[in-house]
């Protein structure tokens, strides 16, 4: 389906999956039972006027940035119930459970290198994820994010575990 994305649109999946591609080529892929609110999206050739604000409330999503360098970094916000995520040109997944706890995993680029950097912030501190498969968890906004750890996984394993993309056919 193709339709225009507007501020305050909500994307909710039940037994299906959804992919949303924005005008700057950023993509959000939602798994089953996920909720995403597009608080604000303004695409403008002038990076100082462009803006993206998303709230991810439940489920699992993969965020693949497009030309976010066309949006000033301070104009990009992604929130979960327990964390705020600052995106610095990257590919990552976020999982939010029924209690609002968040798991954030930085994914590698096509060459297996870091795809960028994200800052995960709560009311008690910030951690930086800048290595492939580096992850942090946040239980409540009033606690610091866990120290980053490197997960012993591959992109195919993460895709299959999180059902972010269908398994590859052999």
Model-derived regions, located:
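Tight coil/turn sites that cap or link beta-strands
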Residues: 8, 25, 32-35, 81-82, ...
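Short glycine-/acidic-enriched loop or helix-start segments at secondary-structure transitions
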Residues: 23, 73, 97
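Conserved short histidine dyad/triad with adjacent acidic residue
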Residues: 37, 42, 87-93, 98
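Short, polar loop/linker segments at the starts of domains and inter-domain junctions
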Residues: 1-4
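Short, small-residue-rich packing micro-motifs
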Residues: 11-20, 29-78, 83, 109-118
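C-terminal interaction modules
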Residues: 14, 47-51, 80-82, 93-170
């Amino acid at each position: 389906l193709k339709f225009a994305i507007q501020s305050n649109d909500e994307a909710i999946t039940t037994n299906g999956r959804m992919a949303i591609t924005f005008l700057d080529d950023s993509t959000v892929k939602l798994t089953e039972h996920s909720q995403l609110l597009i608080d604000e999206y303004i695409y403008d050739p002038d990076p100082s006027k462009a803006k993206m604000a998303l709230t991810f409330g439940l489920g699992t999503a993969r965020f693949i940035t497009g030309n976010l360098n066309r949006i000033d970094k301070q104009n990009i916000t992604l929130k979960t119930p327990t964390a705020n995520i600052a995106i610095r040109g990257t590919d990552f997944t976020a999982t939010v459970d029924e209690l609002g706890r968040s798991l954030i995993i930085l994914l590698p680029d096509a060459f297996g290198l870091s795809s960028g950097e994200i800052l995960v912030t709560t009311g008690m501190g910030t951690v930086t994820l800048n290595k492939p498969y580096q992850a942090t968890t946040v239980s409540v906004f009033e606690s610091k994010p866990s120290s980053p750890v490197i997960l012993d996984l591959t992109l195919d394993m993460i895709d299959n575990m999180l059902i972010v993309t269908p398994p590859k056919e052999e």
